[in-house]
């Protein structure tokens, strides 16, 4: 027991000695950041929305995390206050010393990020824009929009940011951290025809931006953007159509008197396309234009990126054109079938092409004009329907021919029976004459009538046959006004089949070779090729 107590006391003494020995921690970097952050009274934290028409006033976030209106600043403090905590915690591109020097430089020149840069001549600030399209994910005619991912780069000169390279270790260009976008003036660029923007979250791997400043005060800002933009389509020539989709770039709040956008020239081309493959379209052309847009608040400078998409008709051929053509050919084959189920087959064929038309309408947008595919499916449906009408006529002709044949057979049988009766009567009279020894014995009146009136009877029989035939002809002529024979039916059947076949072939040649060139596609004035400033290479 005493040994256990001694061991516990020894352990307690060792732990006490270890706690009393504290290794000093390197707090220099942390204290250095605290000193810099305490050097400023206010921390800037701007919203992502650019300053412009209808923009909310600038805000700063207090120590309690609540957004408050910025208090009035003295003249010496009227510049962009840096959020040093975000700068240093994220670890800028440059060293802490260079970052501190740039912050002191902004303080010394009393830089105000809310003020538009002013040139010496009082001209507007020119913003040079270049776009690199990395991917176009989808072009949808149902929702009439398209999705694309691009690298957007804009460059402008701010005379207030000119610096002496000696202040930054003789560097002619500074690579600034993306958090400096809160401290410098930026054009309030927006895309007028954008429906949605799927930008990645900040500080994520997919969200990166680039910010550079050279000694002349020229800024270069680049970032990755993902957009879904509307594209008004004309589907008159579907599936042989070409669609013109555009991407607008404009300042939201600054008129052309303050900010003018123009396409970049020189090392950074205005538009560049990576190797892009689309399932339903091919990019035929891509070019850029610029123009002025007038609003109630003034004139604004706008840039356009124009894409010309040519539809790949493979999907429509496999899903619509080939099945509808097969249905038409099947309707022709059923006309040559001599079965009682040919009408059921034709009804099934009509239901098949009707279902094909309904499924096509479900995948297309509701428009008020006729599309090229509507014409093709309509002609196929008309041919199948006319084939059904032709089948009914042929069946009617066949029944009439059978009725005519049956009536003729009955008349021939009646005439043959009367002829046999007359021959039998003649034979009986001759036998009676021989039995009388060839004398001139008068014969019975009945036999006399049968012997003396055979020619008249034959005439009457012939007259009855002619009358019956005339009655049959008049009855059929009342129905069809022509004499229907087996030859007539086969001739009608053959001629109609040839008309269907050659008519459909001529229609297909006209539809695929001539019709796509008859329609004149209207050109958007904003994407007039004659005004294009740059054409991108298509890979």
Curated annotation (Swiss-Prot):
GO annotation, cellular component aspect: GABA-A receptor complex; neuromuscular junction; plasma membrane; postsynapse
A GO MF term: excitatory extracellular ligand-gated monoatomic ion channel activity
Hydrolase as UniProt keyword: no
Gene3D superfamilies noted in UniProt: Neurotransmitter-gated ion-channel ligand-binding domain, Neurotransmitter-gated ion-channel transmembrane domain
Matching PROSITE patterns: NEUROTR_ION_CHANNEL
Ranges per topology, Extracellular: 17-314
Keyword annotations from UniProtKB, A to Z: Cell membrane, Disulfide bond, Ion channel, Ion transport, Membrane, Receptor, Signal, Synapse, Transmembrane, Transmembrane helix, Transport
Signal sequence, start to end: 1-16
Loss of function: phenotype: Defective in enteric muscle contraction resulting in abnormal defecation cycles and moderate to severe constipation.
GO BP terms in the entry: chloride transmembrane transport; defecation; lipid transport involved in lipid storage; positive regulation of intestinal lipid absorption; positive regulation of muscle contraction; potassium ion transport; sodium ion transport
Membrane-crossing residue ranges in chain numbering: 315-335, 345-365, 374-394, 494-514
Sequence segments annotated as region (Disordered): 48-93
Ranges facing Cytoplasmic side: 395-493
KW Glycosyltransferase (keyword) present: no
Recorded topology in the membrane: Multi-pass membrane protein
Cysteines paired by S-S bonds: 231-245
Subcellular location: Synapse; Cell membrane
Chief location: other
Record text on subunit structure and interactions: Interacts with tax-6; tax-6 may be involved in negative regulation of exp-1 activity. May self-associate to form homodimer.
Note: Resistant to channel blocking activity of mecamylamine and bicuculline.
Family that this chain belongs to: Belongs to the ligand-gated ion channel (TC 1.A.9) family. Gamma-aminobutyric acid receptor (TC 1.A.9.5) subfamily.
Function statement: GABA receptor that functions as an excitatory cation channel. Permeable to monovalent cations such as Na(+) and K(+). Has negligible divalent cation permeability. Does not act as a chloride channel. Mediates enteric muscle contractions required for defecation. Probably by regulating the defecation motor program, required for fatty acid uptake by intestinal cells.
Name of this protein: Gamma-aminobutyric acid receptor exp-1
